[in-house]
Amino acid sequence: MTARAAGGSASRANEYADVPEMFRELVGLPAGSPEFQRHRDKIVQRCLPLADHIARRFEGRGEPRDDLIQVARVGLVNAAVRFDVKTGSDFVSFAVPTIMGEVRRHFRDNSWSVKVPRRLKELHLRLGTATADLSQRLGRAPSASELAAELGMDRAEVIEGLLAGSSYHTLSIDSGGGSDDDARAITDTLGDVDAGLDQIENREVLRPLLEALPERERTVLVLRFFDSMTQTQIAERVGISQMHVSRLLAKSLARLRDQLE
């Protein structure tokens, strides 16, 4: 992460520094009372820029901007309703995956254009919800193993679902996108469409392809998509440059795409 990117992330955190206190005040009100609802609405209103920021990251994918903003705001409302201040976690960290999950659900319901079985679509949706819940409890993005334990399923199934989701928008990591080059952001998981995995049908097809990748490419791919690491973190773990990580990711996805075509 560049110094400017770090500064951008810090400014975003400071932007919502008053939100934790707003939630503490909410807890002191009678649940379900008019005062409680008004105060929660105030929190939602306060965080609308967060939802709108996420919605803008998904522009240019065939959905009207106003629709994306509306869907993202619904996700924000859901996050405010579900957030448990007693966990001690940060609301923004919880809200981001919740909002993103709502937007992704919108795309799944309205514009999923690749050949992914319904079972995998539903699995990816469950993973989105579980990711939001675990992120709140853990204070960080969960690993594939933690998601598997949460959902009571095999880790291979979780990996399959994560890759199925990547089939319609491979996630970019260290770039905030657009002209705002200090917007790494709120999250490292927004990115552009990559059709490289659009013919994933089942794990029997995917597993041998992953195993056939060179060890370093497979390692980088697993760290990125299954362990939720950024390119910078992967570079530090593997001992190579961030640019090299980026090239390896592109190369490994290209290999998978060629094999799946």
From Swiss-Prot:
GO terms for biological process: cellular response to cold; cellular response to nitrogen starvation; DNA-templated transcription initiation; lipid metabolic process; positive regulation of DNA-templated transcription; regulation of DNA-templated transcription; response to anoxia; response to antibiotic. Residues 231-250 bind DNA. The gene is sigF. Disruption phenotype: Infected guinea pigs mutant and wild-type bacteria grow comparably. A double rsbW-sigF disruption shows no effect in the presence or absence of rifampicin. The lineage of its organism: Bacteria, Bacillati, Actinomycetota, Actinomycetes, Mycobacteriales. Belongs to the sigma-70 factor family. Keywords: DNA-binding, Sigma factor, Transcription, Transcription regulation. This is RNA polymerase sigma factor SigF. Induction: Constitutively expressed at a low level under all conditions tested, including stationary phase and several stresses. 3-fold induced during starvation. Positively controls expression of its own operon (rsbW-sigF). Signal peptide: none annotated. Residues 123-189 are annotated as: Sigma-70 factor domain-3. Residues 209-258 are annotated as: Sigma-70 factor domain-4. Monomer. Interacts transiently with the RNA polymerase catalytic core formed by RpoA, RpoB, RpoC and RpoZ (2 alpha, 1 beta, 1 beta' and 1 omega subunit) to form the RNA polymerase holoenzyme that can initiate transcription. Interacts (via sigma-70 factor domain 4) with anti-sigma-F factor RsbW (UsfX) with a possible 2:1 RbsW:SigF stoichiometry, which inhibits SigF activity. A motif (Interaction with polymerase core subunit RpoC) lies at residues 67-70. It comes from the Bacteria. Sigma factors are initiation factors that promote the attachment of RNA polymerase to specific initiation sites and are then released. Held in an inactive form by a cognate anti-sigma factor RsbW (UsfX) until released. Increased expression decreases growth rate, and after 3 days increases the expression of 51 loci encoding 33 protein-coding genes as well as some non-coding RNA. Residues 43-112 are annotated as: Sigma-70 factor domain-2. The keyword Transcription regulation applies.
